[in-house]
Amino acid sequence: MGQKVHPNGIRLGIVKPWNSTWFANTQDFADNLDGDFKVRKFLNKELANASVSRIIIERPAKSIRVTIHTARPGIVIGKKGEDVEKLRNAVSQIAGVPAQINIAEVKKPELDAKLVADSIASQLERRVMFRRAMKRAVQNAMRLGAKGIKVEVSGRLGGAEIARSEWYREGRVPLHTLRADIDYNTAEAHTTYGVIGVKVWIFKGEILGGMAAVIESEQQPAAQPKKQARKGRK
């Protein structure tokens, strides 16, 4: 029976960057890793309703820098930045070093696998029909420019006695092509019948040039649309 490798894990260092970027010697490595795990667990719990996509952790010179990618930055920042200051103090206490928190906005949440999976899971918890939730997510992603998307849900679908899996795909999702930019993530829907698992694969196109191209695209600011000069009457 064929098994699927984790799409993010197999592409690390090829077209996918790491979520934690720091270097540590043997003595500090375990502490840093444990600190990262605790910080992520805390932030995911605190920001459960803030549409958090990714949490990037860097550790420059005995400090910690956390970048939160979210579709709703206003909720994370709070009124006059109060909430983000509370998060900074809490992260600093967990990690044991001074903390800095940056917020990055996700411009198109419909093309982010984590946010799509969370959206489907929340709909299933609200008793929306699973086929409708899947189809809506697929249509929104394709409308906004995805090259392909696949959604799979598994569990006691519709309250059935026997658990099963169902999936829906549109476009192409090349899992074997290493240069393919495939965003993959999962979520869980806790329903009255039990847990339903949600998996989402989104194919955004091929990346030519490897990690160098990925880093360059992340560093470049989003291009501002040019305002056309209005022609006056002569």
From Swiss-Prot:
Source domain of life is: Bacteria
Alphabetized PROSITE patterns for the sequence = KH_TYPE_2, RIBOSOMAL_S3
Give the record's GO biological process terms: translation
Q: Which GO terms describe its cellular component?
A: cytosolic small ribosomal subunit
Specify whether Nucleus is a keyword of the entry: no
Keywords attached to this entry: Ribonucleoprotein, Ribosomal protein, RNA-binding, rRNA-binding
Entry keyword Transcription: no
Q: Which GO terms describe its molecular function?
A: mRNA binding; rRNA binding; structural constituent of ribosome
UniProt xrefs under InterPro entries: KH_dom, KH_dom-like_a/b, KH_dom_type_2, KH_sf_prok-type, Ribosomal_S3_C_sf, Ribosomal_uS3_bac-typ, Ribosomal_uS3_C, Ribosomal_uS3_CS
Q: Where is the KH type-2 domain?
A: 39-107
Where in this chain does the entry annotate a coiled-coil region?
none
Name any one Pfam family assigned in the record: Ribosomal_S3_C
What does this protein's UniProt record list under function? Binds the lower part of the 30S subunit head. Binds mRNA in the 70S ribosome, positioning it for translation.
* NCBIfam families named among the record's database cross-references: rpsC_bact
User: Which family is annotated?
Assistant: Belongs to the universal ribosomal protein uS3 family.
The identity of this protein, by name, is: Small ribosomal subunit protein uS3
Source species of the chain: Haemophilus ducreyi (strain 35000HP / ATCC 700724)
